[in-house]
């Protein structure tokens, strides 16, 4: 049977309307002598379509984002195809389905058409895709229709859906519309097919084959007849049920039928009768209706049912998409716990990660929003946020710690363990962490992927190149510095006329401002009340002002960067070659994560924001004290291009297969020491709730702030939250028994020496004394009106009495709870009690009470003072003359309202690393002030901060190697 049958059947429903009935067609009479029950598809179809319309209306009332949509692809302008498309459009709109018409010229070639279909497959706003047949002969219809993804194959003709239909123990996503309509029509008329001898006339993939599968599934005994079938009449005469779908007008005669049989006529044929065209079926209705017990008319039988089933399929497709989008469930990867706990790299290598595409699907991320980098890591497109921005954010948890010690308190381990524990409790937990620099990985610190059974994997990818974001930051930063140095060189070696000729070239008789310099040109023109379009009439003085930056070399703020610990780049000279004509300058390298470009990556809210921030970077002052920006240099567009992929968060996973966004890695000393705003925003929407969800359906986003509450957490709130407008529900403050003993007066640790016994045996006095440090950090959290849960990172050398001392001190200081957590040895199961306490704190929190330490309008000096007094417990701040001079410059340049990012030691609440526990009676000296205008903060220097570390005598790289099978060993 020709594939056009299905579209002809679609038409039948509409032929009942006089407004759509072609005048050239006549219709056969059903006759008055019929004894058969008429299976009226028109009435049932209307009932079903009303039901579909009511369901759509109800779902839209519950979820304003529920918008089922059908797209029809039409190639060429055949008039009959135009009629069918209009019919489907009308039917769709009647039940509340959006309609998208996609016409293409008859000349379109196969690759282009398949590309357009792929775009529809990838479009999450489209739920059903139909290709209007027939197609021009140069297009392969099967290839085209099979290219439609199964969830959107609402015709149900694709191999995937037909294949599942043919299997006894499987169910297709969508049933073919006409066969499905036949079964519904029989069911509505209380005709059970179980045990019947059913004969199907025709074996097309549109009706014959699929209806045979449906009948068989409903326990009929099915015979499929076709043009080669012998004794066809004999088969028909033995049939209890006849499905006629062979495309031959009035082929089946009444005398062939078994008395009392049921006849379903799928055919639609135009024949000449008395000089007029008449529509008839494949069954001779007049004779058949006298023998059959029930029969479908033509038109008004199967045709309207096809349309109704198509509408049902489209709505079902939209419901499936909605369910996949709303309901997220993470399947945990089981751990094989061992004692003693093996090395981190052994554990990481022994666990097979999930395919990242599968994890993304569990979270509700579409394939089209994922850019895979191999099997276990991927970038997530920022379009996810736009798609989900209507959601209420999930719960937001920030992990901080007490003052760090050489032991390491394990904040990253807590983050991993906590989200794994959320998974055990049936909650979606998403970690958001920084990408570690390769410098420390090969230096003294080692990796930063967590530890034990609470890690981020693959560990080697996490600690090394990942997706190349840090390399992109390195390239962008170094392009900026190279552009600045080169511009200085050219200004020193060329005349005004030569600079004007090269920077404002004449094309077709008109001077052209380069795209990257349009902003600078517009500002200069505005300051001179000149029309920026009138470039040709600009004065030589104005053109000179435009092309000459007049950089003061002594004020250059940006250094070249490298993601390697290399102490010998701390002070260098550039421009020593003879080709640079004496343009020699002392400078230095920083580590890549100390670059302002990295801070911008972390603090940008979207691509446009990143572009603006890169443009606002102040790279030097001119000789008159005015700020020179990357925008003045014309390089901000190129920097954005280099970072266009880096701005997309990286998706990885924990050992137990819970999701982790790993994105950005700004230096914690001179920057915010936190992962990106973008990662947090996307994660909060993925963990968020729809308007109809219950509050308890919300998931949890767990992120980390570098170092302790006085450093990373203070910057997290006063800088990151200020720009993101996001407010955490709870702080998790990490502490350990060993760290508190050190703060409580325990002996200092000496490099290479054994750990003193005090840290390995119970010592209640040291723990009690050290709790003062923890209490101060709890108080710091409360200054922002955020509840605190203390996580006691457990070790086998701890005693229950030591834990109880910590718990009592934490509760007395106002913590919601203090919970020992053994995630390092037990994975998520070891952190379940901690997770429960965090959930309780989130339920009880009201982040509307959140407050910042200072307003933007507060003076720079007062901002620094309030941080020192409130966070560190200092008596005050003492500014050097250089720092005061810098402050005046920043105010003059318009940067006085920026927040403060203090640069000091992490090893003390004070500026002095030797001052342990909770220092008293000290003043913080500020020797210098620096500006990161693009990132959006000023950083006072309260200590000498090395911005490029060196390598120790025995660096971590000594133990790192790769095996013949490609497995990396020695990472920690």
UniProtKB/Swiss-Prot annotation:
Residue segments, region Formyltetrahydrofolate synthetase: 341-972
The UniProt record lists the keyword S-adenosyl-L-methionine: no
GO MF annotations in UniProt: ATP binding; formate-tetrahydrofolate ligase activity; methenyltetrahydrofolate cyclohydrolase activity; methylenetetrahydrofolate dehydrogenase (NADP+) activity
Location in the cell: Mitochondrion
Transmembrane domains' residue ranges: none
Cellular component per GO, a single term: mitochondrion
EC number(s) recorded for this UniProt protein: 1.5.1.5, 3.5.4.9, 6.3.4.3
Protein name: C-1-tetrahydrofolate synthase, mitochondrial
Lineage of the organism: Eukaryota, Fungi, Dikarya, Ascomycota, Taphrinomycotina
Name of the gene this protein is made from: ade9
């Amino acid at each position: 049977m020709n594939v056009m049958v299905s579209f002809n059947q679609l038409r039948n429903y509409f032929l009942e309307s006089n407004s759509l009935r072609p005048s050239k067609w006549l219709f056969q009479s059903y006759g008055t002598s019929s004894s058969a029950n008429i299976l009226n598809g028109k009435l049932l179809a209307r009932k079903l379509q009303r039901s579909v319309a009511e369901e759509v209306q109800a779902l839209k009332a519950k979820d304003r984002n529920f918008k089922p949509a059908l797209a029809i692809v039409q190639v060429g302008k055949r008039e009959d195809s135009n009629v069918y498309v209009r019919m489907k459009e009308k039917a769709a709109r009647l039940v509340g389905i959006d309609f998208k018409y996609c016409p293409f010229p008859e000349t379109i070639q196969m690759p282009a058409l398949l590309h357009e279909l792929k775009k529809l497959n990838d479009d999450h706003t489209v739920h059903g895709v139909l290709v209007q047949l027939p197609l021009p002969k140069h297009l392969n219809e099967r290839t085209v229709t099979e290219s439609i993804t199964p969830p959107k194959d609402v015709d149900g003709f694709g191999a995937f859906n037909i294949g599942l239909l043919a299997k006894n123990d499987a169910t297709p996503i969508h049933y073919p519309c006409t066969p499905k309509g036949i079964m519904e029509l029989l069911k509505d008329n209380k005709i059970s097919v179980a045990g019947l001898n059913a004969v199907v006339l025709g074996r097309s993939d549109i009706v014959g084959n699929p209806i045979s599968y449906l009948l068989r599934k409903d326990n009929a005994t099915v015979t499929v007849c076709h043009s080669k079938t012998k004794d066809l009449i004999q088969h028909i005469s033995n049939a209890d049920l006849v499905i006629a779908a062979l495309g031959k007008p009035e082929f089946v005669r009444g005398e062939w039928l078994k008395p009392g049989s049921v006849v379903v006529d799928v055919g639609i044929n135009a024949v000449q009768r008395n000089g007029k065209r008449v529509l008839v079926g494949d069954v001779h209705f007049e004779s058949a209706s006298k023998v059959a017990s029930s029969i479908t008319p033509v038109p008004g039988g199967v045709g309207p049912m096809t349309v109704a089933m198509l509408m049902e399929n489209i709505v079902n497709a939209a419901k499936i998409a909605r369910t996949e989008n709303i309901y997220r469930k993470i399947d945990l990867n089981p751990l094989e716990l061992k004692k003693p706990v093996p090395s981190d790299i052994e554990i990481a290598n022994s666990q097979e990660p999930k395919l990242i595409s599968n994890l993304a699907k569990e979270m509700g991320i579409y394939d089209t929003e994922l850019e895979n980098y191999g099997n276990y890591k991927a970038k997530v497109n920022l379009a996810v946020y736009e798609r989900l921005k209507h959601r209420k954010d999930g719960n937001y948890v920030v992990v901080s710690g007490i003052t760090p010690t050489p032991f390491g308190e394990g904040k990253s381990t807590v983050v991993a363990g906590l989200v794994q524990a959320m998974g055990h409790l049936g909650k979606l937990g998403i970690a958001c962490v920084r990408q570690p620099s390769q410098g420390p990985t090969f230096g003294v610190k080692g990796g930063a992927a967590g530890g034990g059974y609470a890690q981020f994997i693959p560990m080697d990818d996490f600690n090394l190149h990942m997706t190349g974001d840090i390399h992109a930051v390195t390239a962008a930063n170094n392009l900026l510095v190279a552009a600045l140095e080169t511009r200085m060189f050219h200004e020193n070696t060329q005349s005004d006329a030569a600079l004007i000729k090269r920077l404002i070239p004449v094309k077709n008789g008109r001077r052209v401002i380069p795209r990257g310099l349009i902003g600078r040109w517009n500002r200069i023109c505005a300051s001179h009340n000149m029309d920026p379009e009138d470039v040709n009439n600009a004065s030589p003085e104005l053109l000179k002002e435009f092309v000459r930056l007049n950089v003061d070399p002594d004020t250059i703020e940006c250094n070249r960067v490298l993601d390697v610990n290399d102490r010998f780049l701390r002070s260098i000279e550039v421009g020593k070659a003879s080709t640079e004509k004496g343009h020699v300058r002392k400078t230095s390298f920083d580590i890549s994560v100390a670059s302002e470009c990295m801070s911008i990556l972390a603090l940008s809210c979207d691509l446009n924001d990143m572009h603006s921030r890169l443009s606002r970077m102040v790279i030097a002052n001119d000789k008159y004290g005015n700020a020179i920006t990357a925008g003045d240099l014309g390089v901000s567009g190129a920097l954005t291009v280099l970072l266009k992929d880096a701005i997309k968060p990286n998706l990885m996973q924990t050992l137990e297969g819970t999701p982790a966004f790993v994105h950005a890695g700004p230096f914690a000393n001179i920057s915010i020491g936190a992962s990106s705003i973008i990662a947090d925003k996307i994660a909060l929407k993925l963990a968020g709730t729809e308007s109809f969800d219950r509050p308890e359906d919300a998931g949890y986003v767990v992120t980390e702030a570098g170092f302790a509450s006085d450093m990373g957490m203070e910057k997290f709130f006063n800088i990151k939250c200020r720009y993101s407008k996001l407010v955490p529900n709870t702080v998790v403050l990490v502490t350990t028994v060993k760290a508190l003993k050190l703060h409580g007066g325990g002996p200092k640790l000496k490099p290479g020496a054994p750990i003193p016994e005090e840290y390995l045996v119970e010592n209640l006095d040291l723990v009690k004394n050290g709790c003062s440090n923890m209490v101060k950090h709890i108080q710091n959290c409360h200054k922002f009106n955020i509840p605190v849960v203390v996580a006691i990172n457990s070790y086998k050398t701890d005693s229950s009495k030591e834990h109880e001392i910590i718990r009592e001190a934490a509760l007395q200081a106002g913590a919601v709870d203090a919970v020992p957590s053994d995630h390092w040895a037990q994975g998520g199961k070891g952190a379940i009690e901690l997770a429960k306490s965090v959930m309780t704190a989130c339920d009880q929190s009201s982040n509307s009470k959140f407050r910042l330490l200072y307003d933007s309008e507060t003076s720079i000096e007062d901002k620094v003072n309030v941080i020192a007094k409130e966070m560190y417990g200092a008596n005050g701040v003492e500014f050097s003359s250089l720092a005061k001079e810098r402050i005046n410059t920043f105010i003059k340049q318009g940067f006085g309202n920026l927040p403060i990012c203090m640069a000091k030691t992490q090893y003390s609440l004070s500026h002095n690393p030797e001052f342990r526990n909770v220092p008293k009676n000290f003043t913080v000296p500020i020797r210098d002030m620096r500006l990161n205008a693009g990132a959006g903060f000023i950083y006072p220097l309260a200590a000498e901060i090395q911005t490029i570390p060196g390598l120790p005598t025995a660096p971590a790289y000594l133990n790192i190697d790769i095996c013949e099978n490609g497995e990396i060993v020695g990472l920690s």
